[in-house]
From Swiss-Prot:
UniProt family annotation: Belongs to the eukaryotic ribosomal protein eL40 family.
Alphabetical list of InterPro entries matching this protein: Ribosomal_eL40_arc, Ribosomal_eL40_dom, Ribosomal_eL40_sf, Ribosomal_zn-bd
One of the protein's GO biological processes: translation
One example GO MF annotation: structural constituent of ribosome
A Pfam family annotated for this UniProt entry: Ribosomal_L40e
Residues in coiled coil: none
Highest taxon, organism lineage: Archaea
Gene: rpl40e
Organism: Methanococcus aeolicus (strain ATCC BAA-1280 / DSM 17508 / OCM 812 / Nankai-3)
Name of the protein in its database record: Large ribosomal subunit protein eL40
UniProt KW Ribosomal protein keyword: yes
Amino acid sequence: MAFEEAMNRVFHKKICLRCTARNPWKATKCRKCGYTKLRPKAKESRG
């Protein structure tokens, strides 16, 4: 149970496409720059 909880805390975020800031999952705009285009944080590496 603790592992799933930790994974959710790490990966259940949204990333701003303009400034790459981490935002809460329920965010509709970036907390730093106000940009509205957010993507979910990648769960797998891109390598």
